[in-house]
Amino acid sequence: MKRSYPDDLVIGNLSRRGFLKGVGATGVLLVAANWGWRDALAAEKKAFGADAMPHGWVDNPKIYVSIDRDGTVGIVCNRSEMGQGVRTSLAMVVADELEADWSRVKVIQAPGDEARYGNQDTDGSRSMRHWFEPMRRCGAAARQMLEQAAANQWKVPLGECRAEQNKVLHAPSGRSLSFGELAEAAAGLEVPARDKLLLKKPEQFRYIGKDVARAIDGADIVNGRAGFGFDARFDDMLYAVVARPPVYGGKLKRYDAAAALKVPGVVKVIEIEGRPIPSEFQPLGGVAVVAQNTWAAIKGREALVVEWDAGVNGGYDSVAYRKQLEEAARKPGKVVRDSGDAAALFARGGDIVEAEYYLPHLAQAPMEPPVSTAWYKDGACEVWAPTQAPQVTRERIAERLKLPFDKVTVNVTLLGGGFGRKSKPDFVLEAAILAKAFPGRHLRVQWTREDDLHFSYFHTVSVERLQAVLGADELPQAWLHRSVAPSITALFGPDSKHQGAFELGMGLTNLPFAIPNVRLENPEAPAHTRVGWFRSVSNIPHAFAIQSFVGELAAKAGQDPKDYLLKLLGPARRIDTAELGDSWNYGESPERYPLDVGRLRGVIEEAARQSGWGGELPRGRARGIAAHYSFVTYVAVVIEVEVKDDGALLVHKATIAADCGPQINPERIRSQLEGACVMGLGLAALGEISFKDGKVQQDNFHQYELARMPLAPKAVSVHLLKPDGDLPLGGVGEPGVPPIAPALCNAIFAATGKRIRELPIRNQLQGWRKA
């Protein structure tokens, strides 16, 4: 069987015993971190971080380090790479503690197997904060084993041996041995006990924290050798596209495949059974056209005659639904936080300010649409997919095909963007289901851009209504916020009409303002389409509404927006988020990860200073500021804009300040924040998915527009605050998105006097001078 695919992205479905045996036969060093995590944590009342994740640590994280005889250092990455640099950053950590020569490092992608690799969900901006320490320990353990092997061979004290750049040196004699020469002997040694590990001090780091551009896959991506989902190619390939019900919950009534089967290259037409609401991560169902090439499959689908039953969501209309959300926002809802007595102050009246904000559904729209290749034979299934959740994918395939778990192999390719869409494996299941109909042949299911936009797990639509009772100092004495949005939890329960704790904890319940009376409510909002994870999730609507409202209050008070925001935050202090009603805190310990107002103030001050806040600007330009805490990271943004007479929006500069704790790979951190800025601008200015008769109205990028060069900032500067003291790692992939929209809209107000309360902005600036 001929295969065109990078070997380092494929691992065979070996048992642990088989893998170890194979490694021993080739004489390489293999290290598995194994220190009985459950025993160590047994006394804790509640687990946090990776320990709280499904299979987060199990009994052995099984993060492997291997060294070949030629000195090549193999590092297994258990997280999915989608441009955030995790394959590079995790490898950097191991290589640093190991003292590996970076030019000799090879990264091997782990297949979906949580029992071996621990939790593999690549979401929540938590890969580095959950795996930094385990990877350090693995690197350190391997280093000490190599040093011990050298000491044994030279018959010298261990303390005289020191690993450095793929060698172990014996300073007194000047002798050295390469890692490759020591690998076989080191492999026979016991892994050092956890309390015997000698981790490097920060000043000894060679790669960690160094501001050097490294990208383990960079050259391959540039020259086309990198393996994305589309690059899994075999000589016996079949290709399929699927006609899916255009309305969520719809069903197939009838179809006629006669014309489709006449299309040259079409092999077969197969019905896929969908799952009734709630669909969870299952395929929507429909009719698949299988062909000898993608084009034939697409033309065959066009020739299908299909009749659908729209079902309960056939009347879903974005315009009408917005009105429902607005009506709900004007009535009391489920109370999710009630500090002081806000109700009494609002009943008393006085200087009350209110505003309402709207955000539509959004689609992740990764540049690489969903795609998956599957192979089925003799009761076993193997897939190649750009998935963010390989273990969930494996579980769902086993369930759907009624296979033993160990008969399913999920190979993780590079992802051409993910943004949360590829954490749902419906597209991989489609390939597995269809491959079973063609035993022994590889079958790829390809989604078109239209498929991607029509059948995504969309970011929620939202109405946010805020009110404040102002005191004599123009600061809020009482605060009321009603957040109305369908929840991701509706994927799992049909009657779910309130946001989950994890959604509420994304900028709503953990509001850090020093306001004595706060009431937060979450009215009902039923879901009429698939709502799913999206880069930064519910932080987007919460940050947009709250930071825009702060801008409005500052303008009413006639005060500088930055100074007003700092007054609202109050003095530097550390808040236990549970005291605010946030029971989630991004899954982290409130003791280790308190909401630190001082750090939030710090990024605001830094962004303002670096942007030249308060300084003069050319005529027609203005600045806006916003700040937000998400994924245990603090980000502030200043946007400098110009609005032309015809309403054209120019973003001259974006200044970003972030405090994410220790910085493992500063270059990748900056690149993610830069990318978040461009994405956030595109969402704010252009992003909207709308529905009519239950169907998505946008087909491609001419209707669902992304940020293009004219909208991108002429300059983006990212400033990373150095951690003060022993701070834990924060997230990076998502925190840069939420403050972008409010900073942009606050800047637009400063430039034009026009307040933007609904997104996208699109044509709202046309005729602003006349207004």
Predicted regions and their residues:
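N-terminal export leaders
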Residues: L14-W35, Y564
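Glycine-rich loop/linker segments at domain edges
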Residues: E114-Y117, R126-W131, L182-D231, G333-S372, ...
